[in-house]
């Protein structure tokens, strides 16, 4: 891992990663350790990397019921501990963001399909929602814009923050490259001001993945768009958390392109 002080030498964006996310817990074969391994191989020499600690139970229970937490624990030690570590990564990335530094949480399992009472879609705990809820509960921020870039709507995130005026969740979707980028641009132009920009960064919209839409260069453009809006609206307070993305040959390059855009390269 790279020392925290090396940030300026290796890039403005911080990557948060823990090797526990490589654990082969029981899940779908497409949501495999090779996903984060190939991404890490592309990011490790381009950005500083920090190692998180697992999330605390009280943070998890701000957004998930005790009964749901118990069900995740019953999935087995590897699943539960890896899920806690993924949440801890998102929490650390969000803490970087409120200091004005962009951060990317390289995690598995993903989280945006995990709601208050249930979980599905390869998700167990809602990584990004726990991080946001902790910042709000501690009085660090008062308003958040969540942009979900994944092919599938972040229904868990929507359900967690349903009726909460402090958090606005926007899912981006379209059938073509130009329509997708235009949809994102329009959503950002209408967003107004907020204290933090949080991004559920899914890459299954890729042309060779399930979504069959975007190319690698588009992810850099998306990162740039998000960085620009964060600079204008919330003093560069922006973090992203990995969600989907399953086409292994190009997944690392796609995430690298996104991170370079978010870092302003």
Task: Please tell me what each predicted stretch does.
Residues 2-12, 16, 45, 67-265:
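A general "terminal functional-core" signal
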Residues 2-61:
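N-terminal low-complexity, Ser/Thr- and acidic-residue-enriched intrinsically disordered segments
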């Amino acid at each position: 891992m790279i020392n925290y002080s090396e940030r300026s030498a290796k890039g403005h964006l911080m990557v948060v990663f823990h090797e526990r996310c490589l654990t082969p817990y029981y899940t779908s074969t497409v949501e495999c350790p090779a996903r984060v391994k190939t991404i890490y191989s592309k990011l490790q020499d381009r950005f500083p990397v920090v190692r998180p600690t697992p999330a605390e139970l009280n943070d998890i229970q701000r957004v998930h019921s005790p009964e749901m937490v118990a069900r995740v624990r019953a999935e087995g030690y590897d699943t539960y501990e890896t899920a806690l570590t993924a949440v801890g990564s998102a929490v650390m990335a969000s803490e970087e963001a409120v200091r004005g530094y962009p951060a990317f949480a390289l995690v598995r399992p993903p989280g945006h399909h995990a709601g208050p009472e249930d979980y599905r879609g390869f998700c167990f705990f809602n990584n990004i929602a726990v991080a946001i809820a902790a910042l709000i509960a501690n009085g660090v921020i008062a308003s958040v814009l969540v942009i979900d870039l994944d092919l599938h709507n972040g229904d868990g995130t929507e359900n967690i923050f349903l009726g909460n005026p402090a958090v606005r969740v926007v899912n981006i979707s379209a059938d073509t490259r130009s329509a997708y980028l235009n949809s994102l641009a329009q959503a950002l132009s209408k967003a107004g001001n907020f204290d933090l920009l949080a991004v559920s960064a899914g890459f299954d919209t890729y042309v060779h993945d399930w979504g069959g839409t975007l190319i690698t260069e588009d992810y850099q453009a998306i990162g740039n768009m998000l960085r620009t809006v964060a600079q204008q609206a919330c003093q560069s307070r922006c973090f992203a958390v990995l969600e989907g993305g399953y086409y292994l040959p190009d997944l690392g390059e796609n995430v690298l392109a996104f991170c370079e855009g978010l870092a302003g390269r």
